[in-house]
């Protein structure tokens, strides 16, 4: 059995079912210990020794055999079969429900964590929590309760019956048990440590494989298949070595249990045979005693397995607890309210920002205002802080008080949900789900309105491309949209954002993979949306030339804000960037 702050509540939640399973288990144990008494009657009857039933002598004949042996044996077997089915359903069913709830809790908490967490913790490691570690917890919860309760009740009842038959022989039989418990406790701690190492090695292996599958095209392009294979073999060998070491310790524990059991059997046969020889025991009593000890063998084995499973379960639960203990950095403050109907005014007011683990400010005293319905381009060199600006607008990170306002509301005084609900976002990587094109475009809604989907696709100039596909809008995209081109991915992502009909549209370098003609068509279509506040991050100045306003960012600072013509005339750094891009375009044409 395992205990922890995130799993203890499930014992109470499943208490009625667990109690029912426990009752069935005790009933099975009782009838299991009734069977050795039947063995004694049969053997004594066949040997001509007295057959005692409830302390009274009985005649051993066919009627006795049917009434006192066969019928009780059949009833016991039926009760044991039904009881075992019942406790298996109760214990293992509870374990499945516990892991289902725990998995949901983990997923819900994961969704609340900030990007910083996922930058530190790799996807492969997280996936191993949802697979290997949860499977281990499920096994430990279900099997652990079974083994603990069965070892406790069956072992205790059997030892009591053995003690009543002969105190000294029972004392001798229990001596190896003390050594087993001491050895098991020591090995259990070592097993827990090795299981943690095993899970960590498996996580690293899973993450490496996941990263390779995602970057397979790059690996092939650079002809690095052999290098990556050698790396995988090294990680796989490390995983193998840890598993082998864990298996050695686990096997040693099992061998010790077997050794103790066999040694006790030798003691029982030796001293028990002596008692039979002296007349203190008859043959039937010796067989009955061995039958009780046979019932103790399973609890002894269960203790060994329980130590191993508990060690594994604790290690896996510790890893899961680390995830559930991860602090939710970006969350609503107490008493916040939803934004009312958003008009689209955005104001940055002397905003300075540094990433939580950063060593310097990535944004410094950023100030500019976007009026409702304006189209604004944000340009600057790579790493100047353009994407950070929209990350803060989307509340991906915490924003300093009094520095960012939407419709004159400080974003820290309104709910994060309402801020994000009012924004439609097209990220740089243009992530698409492994779903139909229709499903991707209508992602913001629970149902698919085909007319609205096609309207959004037309605005992003991707409708004609989709129509050329054999399945049209029902075409299923591969993982991350690998079955479509880069330009098509961008335009499908734009269509998804447009279909949301949010008052604020954010495009983070989202037309870089399309040609100039397609880019112009998309931007012209965006202007037709009345009241739409558009923020477009771009590297090409030509992309934002026609915007109502351009924000020029350099080294985390806003150097200039205004129309293209004004900036070209008044801002030297902006003019140099424009001239340089024109020279690059002319050189490319030549």
Language model feature labels by segment:
Residues 1-35, 47-72, 86-91, 95, ...:
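Membrane-integrated ABC transporters
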Residues 13, 115-116, 132-141, 145, ...:
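An intracellular "coupling" helix at the cytosolic face of ABC transporter transmembrane type-1 domains
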Residues 110, 232, 320, 348-350:
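Conserved catalytic Walker-motif region of ABC-type ATPase nucleotide-binding domains
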Residues 2, 91, 111-156:
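Juxtamembrane loop-to-helix connectors within ABC transporter transmembrane domains
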Residues 13, 17-30, 76-80, 143-197, ...:
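Transmembrane helices of ABC transporter permease
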Residues 339-590:
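ABC-type nucleotide-binding domain
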Residues 161-178, 249-318, 324:
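Helix-loop-helix
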Residues 106, 110, 219, 320, ...:
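Helix-loop junctions and hydrophobic alpha-helical segments within the transmembrane domains
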């Amino acid at each position: 059995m395992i205990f922890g702050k995130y799993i203890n509540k499930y014992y109470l939640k499943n208490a009625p079912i667990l109690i029912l399973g426990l009752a069935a288990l005790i009933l099975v144990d009782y009838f299991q210990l009734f069977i050795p008494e039947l063995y004694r009657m049969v053997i004594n009857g066949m040997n001509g020794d007295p057959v005692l039933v409830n302390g009274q002598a009985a005649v051993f004949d066919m009627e006795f055999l049917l009434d006192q042996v066969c019928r009780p044996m059949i009833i016991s077997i039926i009760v044991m079969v039904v009881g075992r089915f019942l406790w298996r359903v109760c214990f293992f069913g509870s374990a499945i429900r516990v892991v289902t709830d725990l998995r949901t809790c983990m997923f819900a908490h994961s969704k609340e964590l900030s990007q910083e967490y996922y930058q530190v913790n790799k996807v492969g490691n997280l996936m191993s929590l949802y697979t290997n570690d949860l499977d281990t917890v499920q096994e430990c919860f279900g099997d652990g309760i079974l083994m603990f309760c069965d070892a406790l009740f069956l072992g205790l009842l059997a030892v009591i019956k053995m003690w009543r038959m002969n105190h000294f022989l029972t004392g001798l039989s229990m001596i190896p048990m003390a050594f087993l418990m001491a050895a098991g406790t020591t090995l259990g701690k070592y097993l827990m440590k090795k299981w943690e190492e095993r899970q960590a090695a498996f996580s690293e292996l899973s993450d490496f494989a996941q990263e390779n599958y995602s970057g397979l095209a790059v690996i092939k392009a650079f002809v690095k298949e052999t290098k990556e294979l050698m790396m995988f073999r090294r990680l796989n060998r490390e995983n193998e070595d840890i598993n082998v070491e864990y298996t050695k310790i686990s096997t040693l524990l099992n061998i010790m249990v077997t050794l103790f059991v066999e040694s006790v059997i030798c003691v029982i046969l030796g001293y028990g045979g002596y008692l039979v020889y002296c007349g203190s025991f008859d043959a039937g009593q010796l067989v009955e005693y061995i039958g009780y000890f046979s019932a103790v063998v399973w609890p002894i084995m269960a203790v060994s397995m329980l130590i191993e499973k508990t060690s594994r379960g604790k290690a896996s639960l510790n890893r899961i607890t680390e995830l559930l203990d991860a602090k939710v950095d970006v969350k609503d403050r107490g008493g916040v309210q939803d934004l009312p109907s958003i008009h689209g005014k955005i104001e940055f007011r002397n905003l300075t920002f540094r990433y939580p683990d950063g060593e310097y400010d990535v944004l410094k005293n950023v100030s500019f205002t976007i009026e409702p319905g304006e189209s604004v381009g944000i340009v600057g060199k790579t790493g100047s802080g353009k994407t950070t600006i929209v990350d803060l607008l989307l509340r991906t990170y915490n924003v300093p008080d009094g520095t960012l306002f939407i419709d004159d509301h400080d974003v820290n005084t309104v709910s994060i949900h309402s801020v994000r609900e009012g924004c439609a976002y097209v990220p740089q990587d243009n992530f698409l789900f492994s779903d139909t094109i229709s499903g991707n475009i209508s992602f913001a809604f629970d149902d698919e309105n085909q007319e609205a989907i096609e309207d959004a696709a037309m605005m992003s100039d991707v409708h004609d491309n989709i129509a050329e596909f054999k399945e049209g809008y029902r075409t299923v995209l591969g993982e991350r949209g690998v079955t479509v081109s880069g330009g098509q991915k961008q335009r499908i992502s734009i269509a998804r954002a447009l279909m949301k009909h949010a008052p604020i549209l954010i495009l983070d370098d989202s037309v870089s993979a399309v040609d100039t003609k397609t880019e112009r068509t998309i931007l012209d279509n965006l202007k037709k949306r009345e009241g739409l506040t558009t923020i477009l991050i771009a590297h090409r100045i030509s992309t934002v030339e026609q915007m109502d306003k351009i924000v020029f960012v350099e080294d985390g600072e806003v150097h200039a804000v205004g129309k293209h013509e004004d900036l070209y005339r008044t801002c030297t750094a902006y003019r140099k960037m424009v001239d340089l891009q024109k020279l690059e375009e002319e050189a490319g044409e030549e």
